[in-house]
Amino acid sequence: MKGLMILVVFLTLVNIVYANNFLTIYNNNLALYRTNIELELQSGVQFYSIENIPTNIVTESVTFIPRNRNVQLFAQSFEYDLANTQRMMQRYIGQNIRLVTDQGQFTGKLIFNDGANYGLLNEATNELNIVSASKVNNVLLSEMPQDFFLRPTLRWQLSADRAGRYQAELSYLTRGIEWRATYNAILGNNDFTLNSWVTINNRSGKDFKDVNLKLIAGDVQTQVPTQRRMDMTERFSVQAATIPVFEERAFSDFRIYTLDQRADIDNNQEKQLRLYPLKNVRYTRRYEYIVGGNSVDVFINFRNSTANGLGVPLPSGNVNFYEIDESDNTPQFVGVARIGNTSLNQEVNLRIGSAFDVIAETIVANTSSQDRRRDTDYQINLTNNKAEAVEVEVIRSNRGTNVEILNPSISFDRRDASTFVFRVRVPAGGTQSITFRERVSW
């Protein structure tokens, strides 16, 4: 079918003037929208429709607050049975329609429409004409089917004491929109450059224009049912004269980030905004080997403090790590880690992968059991093929509660009742071994 023509007179919707729009987005696929509206009402009880509503609106969250007590809202419904060709044809079963084809026009009562053909009954001759949908250029309908809507619509039943314009506030929750933080860190010898972004994903079914934007970081409890590549530089495309900046502050038990400019968040858009300016953060690289494991893990450790070059609350998100390839001075990806919501002065420990040139193996030399105890002799061999010395934390953890380490070849720290940490320095291009006996009693 090449086209659909509807001969219909539309009812005028409520005259709404939007201003001062507020959008607060949460981490858990939820957002709160608030706006001021102006209604032009007649005296008495009436129906009015509010268009441009998200398809994912949480209908039970809609709040309507008139500025004048002379307006009262009695009932509302959310209309999402949107107009399209197939639904209209189903509504017109048993009614007269007109089909326009290259061979002429066909008029009659629509008996069926299966998508491939129209069945039209000529009531004067009682003939049934079957017209192929592929031959139809236009379908002419006498009017829009009742209770059909072009867009998702809130329909209100309300009353006003007198005709006139009334101010009100409208707010609601919607699903389908969320935000996340993403970080890019370029590692140097002792510090890294941290580039932080906010990514907003809008699948709510509505464009949010010129909104005052706030982001809430933290796990907000609700009863609602249930990455795109970043540039390594500070590139940012904005229409305003200045770069938008998020202002962060504590809010209840959460953190709130307020953008200092208004923003457009369009439907089916993934929008990225800078969270913080570039930060240079001091860090240490840590190597960890779990006794019995197959590899040595690499960790990036830093403290979220001002003295350390950071000192800002960090929303949870992925941290992409890069290192500079000195042969051509370009950043190369070396790993990704997940950071949780991180408060000020909190220690951060992120695993970015396994070391290639630092190798470890565990050898169980001897095991014996007697008198409600078991002794196991371990030898840990470490090899460092790097050009510089490294320190490896060798960790032995046992689920037993009565665990002892006997005859260790080097000193160790006891992290808890059953976890022991040996810090082993391995020379560049060299090897190092440690031995100890583990005794478990019961």
Question: What positions do the PLM features span?
Answer:
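Long, intrinsically disordered, low-complexity accessory segments associated with secretion
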Residues: 3-4, 15-442
